């Protein structure tokens, strides 16, 4: 998931 935890995942 993109931006799920502000890591760009």
UniProtKB/Swiss-Prot annotation:
UniProt record similarity statement: Belongs to the allatostatin family.
Main function: May act as a neurotransmitter or neuromodulator.
Source organism per UniProt: Carcinus maenas
One GO location term (cellular component): extracellular region
Organism lineage string: Eukaryota, Metazoa, Ecdysozoa, Arthropoda, Crustacea
Residues recorded as bearing Leucine amide in the entry: 9
Name of protein: Carcinustatin-11
Record key words, sorted: Amidation, Neuropeptide, Secreted
GO biological process, one term: neuropeptide signaling pathway
Compartment(s) where it occurs, according to its Swiss-Prot or TrEMBL record: Secreted
């Amino acid at each position: 998931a993109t931006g799920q935890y502000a890591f760009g995942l």
